[in-house]
Swiss-Prot record:
An annotated GO BP: mitochondrial respiratory chain complex I assembly
Superkingdom field: Eukaryota
Membrane topology reported for the UniProt record: Multi-pass membrane protein
Broadest EC class assigned to this enzyme: translocase
Gene label: MT-ND2
Name of the featured protein: NADH-ubiquinone oxidoreductase chain 2
One Pfam match: NADH_dehy_S2_C
Keyword terms, alphabetized: Electron transport, Membrane, Mitochondrion, Mitochondrion inner membrane, NAD, Respiratory chain, Translocase, Transmembrane, Transmembrane helix, Transport, Ubiquinone
Residues spanning the membrane: 3-23, 25-45, 59-79, 96-116, 148-170, 178-198, 200-220, 247-267, 276-296, 326-346
Amino acid sequence: MNPLILIMIMLTVILGTTIVMMSSHWLMIWMGFEMNMLAVIPLLMKQYNPRSMEAATKYFLTQATASMLLMLAIIINLLYSGQWTFTKLMNPTASIIMTLAMAMKMGLAPLHFWVPEVTQGISLSSGLILLTWQKLAPLSVLYVISPGINLDLILLMSMMSIAIGGWGGLNQTQLRKILAYSSIAHMGWMASILAFNPTMTLLNLLLYILMTTTTFMLFMATSATTTLSLSHMWNKMPLITSSTLTIMLSLGGLPPLVGFLPKWMIIQELTKNNNITLATLMAITALLNLFFYMRLTYATSLTMFPTMNNMKIKWQFNNKKQMKYLPMLIILSTITLPLAPAITLLN
């Protein structure tokens, strides 16, 4: 892709998300979503092949449907309130429809089916944008309408997302699909605490973006897209591969890595709000995510996949790819929690 065109597309993506996050007018928010969607589609088709075309088409159809639901919710709210600006108390019907629209844009269950398929069909760099930046705008809208959100609906969707994010990743060997299901589960954790403590949702989002960005950058550095290709990297890049596996365990929420912090704080907050049953179910279901990450770590580090005897060994050479920011990102994604014990005192 022409660098000038790429810069223009990236600026449009950033502008669309910024309009959504900074506007107080519903029509401007809808326009921001549309700008963002139309600019992201060329990024998804950066590698021009049938799979990326299919992924971009699925993404467009899903996001267009969500935008129609968003406009329907805006019109219903306009009929009841008589104004285009944000109101703290939305009409219940409009609130439910808007929650469903944002859930479809984010990939919350049961509106999640497009996330693994689209992520698998695009490049790693496009997948990074899809699973990190594209979550900001829908979550900002949910953050604003959180005082009037339907509690039963959002908790049901969050519990389903955590369960499906765990079950879906169990039989996957494609790393992009594993990260897509992990994203669905993390979105479920964020949605579960949204009605009780929206600020904690932002903390969870920050840590999720940090860990996912580091994981994608490590995959881009090793050019790994499957479990098999990751296991063959031990000879070529041992340090990078071990860092990748450590960050995957952090994504799964293994203490004392930083991925454990948001889960710990969310369970604590849910318990304070007398949602003990939900917190218990979420904690048990989160073990599914941790299981497939630990299985992936075990398979790539302690065992050898069945391969042909005449397969060429990957020798270790100096890596030509620039990785200036990776050491800092790896440190932040793994040992932030042990280095900052004061975080555990936050209420």
